[in-house]
């Protein structure tokens, strides 16, 4: 009886410990990493947004493109087509921001 109680307490302590050590910050800030990147160019007409992955917790820097079909694709930020796509998306997003003020 004493051994089963001890094992039960040990199991509970083991289950609770990682949650306490992780703390509230680990729960509120999930980290997205790219482990593989696409090899082929994605046409800019298929892309609608992007975000950069620069976390020190990730094995590599990357850009995640979101397509018009809401798929996320990891790409190498050093690739020329990736830089061109980012520039294009930046310009089109600025155009959309400025349009309402131009209407008067």
Curated annotation (Swiss-Prot):
InterPro entries found in the cross-reference section: Chemokine_b/g/d (IPR039809), Chemokine_CC_CS (IPR000827), Chemokine_IL8-like_dom (IPR001811), Interleukin_8-like_sf (IPR036048)
SUPFAM superfamilies, A to Z: Interleukin 8-like chemokines
Alphabetized GO MF terms: CCR2 chemokine receptor binding; chemokine activity
UniProt tissue specificity: Predominantly expressed in the lymph nodes and thymus. Also found in the salivary glands containing lymph nodes, breast, heart, lung, brain, small intestine, kidney and colon.
GO cellular component, one term: extracellular space
Intracellular or extracellular location(s): Secreted
CDD domains given in the database record: Chemokine_CC (cd00272)
Annotated Gene3D superfamilies: 2.40.50.40
Keyword hit for Secreted: yes
Gene Ontology BP term (one): immune response
Signal sequence range: 1-22
PROSITE patterns: SMALL_CYTOKINES_CC (PS00472)
Induction: By interferon gamma and lipopolysaccharides (LPS).
Disulfide partners: 33-58, 34-74
Keywords assigned by UniProt, alphabetized: Chemotaxis, Cytokine, Disulfide bond, Inflammatory response, Secreted, Signal
Keyword Disulfide bond appears in the UniProt entry: yes
Superkingdom field: Eukaryota
Subunit structure: Homodimer.
Purpose of the protein: Chemotactic factor that attracts eosinophils, monocytes, and lymphocytes but not neutrophils. Potent monocyte active chemokine that signals through CCR2. Involved in allergic inflammation and the host response to pathogens and may play a pivotal role during early stages of allergic lung inflammation.
Family according to the record: Belongs to the intercrine beta (chemokine CC) family.
Designated name of the protein: C-C motif chemokine 12
Classification lineage: Eukaryota, Metazoa, Chordata, Craniata, Vertebrata
């Amino acid at each position: 009886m004493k051994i089963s109680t001890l094992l039960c307490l040990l199991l509970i302590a083991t289950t609770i410990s990682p949650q306490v050590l992780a703390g509230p910050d680990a729960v509120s800030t999930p980290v997205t990493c790219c482990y593989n990147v696409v090899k082929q160019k994605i046409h800019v007409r298929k892309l609608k947004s992007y975000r950069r992955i620069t976390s020190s917790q990730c094995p590599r820097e990357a850009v995640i493109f979101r397509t018009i079909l809401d798929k996320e694709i990891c790409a190498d930020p050093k690739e020329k087509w990736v830089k061109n796509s980012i520039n294009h998306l930046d310009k089109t997003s600025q155009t959309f921001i400025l349009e309402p003020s131009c209407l008067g």
